Regions:
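N-terminal cationic and glycine-rich segments that engage phosphates or anionic surfaces
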Residues: 140-144, 398, 414-416, 427, ...
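Conserved pre-motif I regulatory segment
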Residues: 23-24, 253-299
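Structural detector for short beta-strands of small beta-barrel domains
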Residues: 61-84, 122
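Upstream accessory/linker segments immediately N-terminal to the RecA-like ATPase cores of bacterial MutS
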Residues: 78-269
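Accessory helical-bundle/CTD segments and flexible terminal tails appended to RecA-like ATPase motors
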Residues: 540-550, 556-563, 568-571, 586, ...
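Inter-lobe coupling/hinge segments of SF2-like helicase ATPases
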Residues: 283, 294-614, 674
Length: 704
């Protein structure tokens, strides 16, 4: 077992480092202590088992290893002394090549031995019929045999600055070797024997040794699996513990009663029968709110899956239990729409609903505040205006947050403080989150998924067209308008970018108004620069079918509901991410008629763009699209900067290691179900490791 203090020794004390190198290692790689260096895992490996002959070399060989002799050394001078280079003629029994150096020439001339066998390794260049190798790694054959070089060599993360300061991969390997020698290759095991046996994992000691200095490919694979599992397991233990502690610590108001408000709506006002998925999710929510713990649940549902009905029925449970409920949306348009939908659904039920946004007038707000505090108002829908200090409820029992990734943690916390007993929290998102990402980012929330669309909905037909077929697309829109339908045309920008060949929204609007002339056609325009009132007025005109075409930027991405709209044209579709394209497509297909999404792109497309277009044409399944998006963009990008820190993994990869992540979560849940306080003797290693993680949080910043 390694004494704790050795691992936390400053890197500047390591033999071969010194003050200057220590500073570089800190700033460039975040290495402050021995432990940081040990946790800097190689990002790839070089197979040094194969030796080439010079006559076997090919132009496409990347990195090669040879044995031979230097028979000649010469300095090639140039007009600028700094550009001088040292060239060695290197031979084996099959041929000749050159070795080239551009710096450290004097030291090299003095050090290199003529006619002594060397092992050389490096990247090949081929020029003028001759192979050459710039700045090769070199060992005298006699030394190479003595040191017993690993046949598989690690390549560590590096930066331009480190390379310039001569902290090469070889230097990094040597530093890691030195740490191993100082700590004596001893590593404390931090996983219980039961998990090691169940998961067939090698020991921590064996894993650390073989991740840095693998004996063979089989042991390298085992080391990698062991360390990935360990990393993901401790993230999951933290998240599951957070969930358990939350349930112990925060009591919610138990909604024991299913009363008149819920049953009256269910029996007489439900617009269509609930899908099996909606029923399942409602059952999960009822189990949460019926207990004494505060609900903390994430509700995922693809566009049009019926999340609003589930949210409304949960709010009615609150009303039946003498509580108030609120629903917070990220934009005024979306808040308005929720209000209109829910007001319409609750008409003639006796349940009171109100809307609060930044545009609400002072007089309205005064009445609303009185009704909230008296308990006369049951449901409040609004934007972040709900968070203001002066918005006081008589008894807030449930807070629903729509598209929560648009709200910060502090904003969400303000909702908690609206009652002495924190309200139940239901977070909704129409942006499907891949399972692996949900497990890692929202692993402390309980997750429900509505994975079924209401019956009778026709799947949207998606087509990919090149821009030279725009005229055909417009003719198609005219035919749909003649049937009484409406269309969206979405552009990626407001102002034309000099760097990128975007369609300009204003130009597009002018082109469309020319193609769809008055009085037969009327066109609306909505973009981010309009004032909220102007934006709402344009949306209202479109909603009432006073205009047939809505030209817009992505402000219509979330939540806008116009059942009569049957065509979505996305201009410069290559400029949008998959998730955005899917959200935009979800603005149509909300009625019973067949809907269409047309993706217009330029002829030149990158491979990634091609995959995005093919995925959109192939499937309407938001979860499948989210998985493809995760593979294309990686987890950090997908979650945005707010969440990227959560996923700064050292060795695991959420895309490639999904099976390991699932196993790690299963083991964490299983273990904590049996021993939630980690008191059993066999779990003391875990308790100790968690304690260390809390003390040295900088090492594990990815644990939320």
């Amino acid at each position: 077992m390694i004494p704790e203090n050795i691992l936390h020794t400053s890197i500047s004390h390591l033999r071969g480092v010194g003050a200057q190198r220590a500073e570089l290692l800190k700033t460039e790689l975040g290495i402050y202590e021995y432990q940081d260096l040990l946790n800097l895992f190689p990002n790839r490996y070089i197979d040094r088992t194969k030796f080439y002959k010079i006559n076997e070399l090919q132009n496409n060989n990347a990195e090669v290893q040879l044995v031979g002799k230097i028979v000649n050394l010469r300095t090639v001078e140039s007009a600028h002394q700094k550009s001088n280079r040292l060239v060695a003629t290197f031979v084996d029994e099959t041929g000749t090549m050159e070795l080239v150096w551009f710096k450290g020439l004097k030291w090299l001339r003095d050090s290199l031995k003529i006619n002594e066998p060397y092992v050389i390794f490096g990247k090949l260049n081929f020029f003028g019929g001759t192979f050459s190798m710039p700045h090769p790694e070199m060992d005298l054959l006699s030394e190479f045999k003595k040191t017993g070089h690993s046949s598989i060599q690690p390549v560590y993360p590096s930066t331009e600055k480190l390379a310039k300061r001569n902290i090469t991969n070889r230097v990094m390997r040597q530093l890691v070797q030195t740490v191993f020698e100082e700590i004596g290759y001893n590593f404390s095991e931090n996983l219980p024997d039961t998990i090691l046996t169940t998961m067939n994992l090698i020991s921590k000691r064996e894993a650390m040794r073989n991740i840095h200095f693998p004996t063979n490919q089989s042991l390298l694979t085992k080391a990698s699996i062991r360390l990935k599992f360990e990393e993901l397991f401790y993230i999951q233990v933290q998240l599951v513990l957070k969930n358990l502690l939350h349930k112990q610590k925060f009591q919610g108001q138990p909604f024991k009663k299913v009363g008149d408000a819920f049953m009256n709506f269910y029996n007489h006002h439900l617009p269509f029968p609930l899908t099996n998925a909606q029923k399942r999710v409602l059952k999960e929510i009822r189990a949460d709110v019926g207990s004494n713990a505060q609900m903390n649940r994430l509700l995922q549902g693809d566009v049009g899956s019926g999340k609003t009905i589930v949210a409304l029925m949960t709010m009615l449970l609150a009303v039946d239990n003498r509580c108030q409920a609120c629903l917070m949306a990220p934009t005024e348009i979306l808040a308005n729409q929720h209000y209109q939908t829910i007001s319409e659904l609750l008409k003639n039920t006796g349940v009171t609903v109100a809307l609060l946004t930044g545009s609400s007038k002072t007089k309205e707000r005064r009445i609303l505040d009185e009704q909230l505090q008296s308990g006369e108002l049951s449901i409040l829908i609004g934007t972040h205006a709900l968070l203001e200090e002066k918005v006081q409820f008589q008894n807030l029992g449930l807070a629903i947050i729509d598209e929560q990734h648009r709200f910060g943690v502090e904003q969400r916390a303000k909702l908690w403080r609206k009652n002495t007993i924190p309200p139940h929290i239901l977070v909704m998102t129409a942006t499907p989150i891949p399972r692996t990402l949900a497990m890692s980012v929202y692993g402390d929330l309980d997750v429900s998924v509505i994975d079924e669309l209401p019956p009778g909905r026709k799947p949207i037909k998606t087509l990919h067209q090149y821009e030279n077929r725009r005229a055909e697309t417009y003719e198609f829109i005219k035919r749909e308008i003649d049937k009484g339908r409406q269309a969206y045309v979405v552009y990626p920008l407001i102002e034309e970018s000099e760097a990128l060949d975007f369609k300009n929204l204003t130009e597009g609007y002018e082109y469309i108004t020319a193609s769809f002339p008055l009085p037969k056609y009327k066109v609306s325009i909505v973009h981010g620069k309009l004032k909220p009132a102007e934006k709402d007025a344009e949306m209202e005109r479109f909603l009432r079918n006073e205009t047939q075409i809505m030209v817009a930027t992505t402000v219509i991405e979330v939540g806008v509901n116009v059942p009569n709209a049957s065509v979505m044209v996305i201009e410069s579709a290559e400029r949008f991410g998959l998730s955005q394209l899917h959200q935009l497509r979800g603005r149509v297909g909300r009625g019973s008629e067949q809907s269409y999404c047309i993706l217009l792109t330029g002829n030149k497309m990158s491979n990634e763009t091609r995959i995005r277009m093919e995925t959109m044409v192939r499937t309407n399944d938001g979860f499948e699209i989210a998985e493809v998006d995760l593979k294309l963009r990686g987890p950090g990008d997908l979650m945005g900067t707010q969440q990227s820190g959560v996923l700064a993994l050292k060795i695991a990869d959420l895309v490639k290691d999904q099976d390991i992540l699932k196993a790690a979560r299963f083991q964490a849940i299983d273990l904590l179900k049996a021993d939630p306080n980690l008191e059993l003797p066999q779990n003391q290693r875990i308790a100790y490791t968690l304690n260390q993680l809390q003390r040295h949080k900088n090492l594990w910043t990815y644990i939320s």
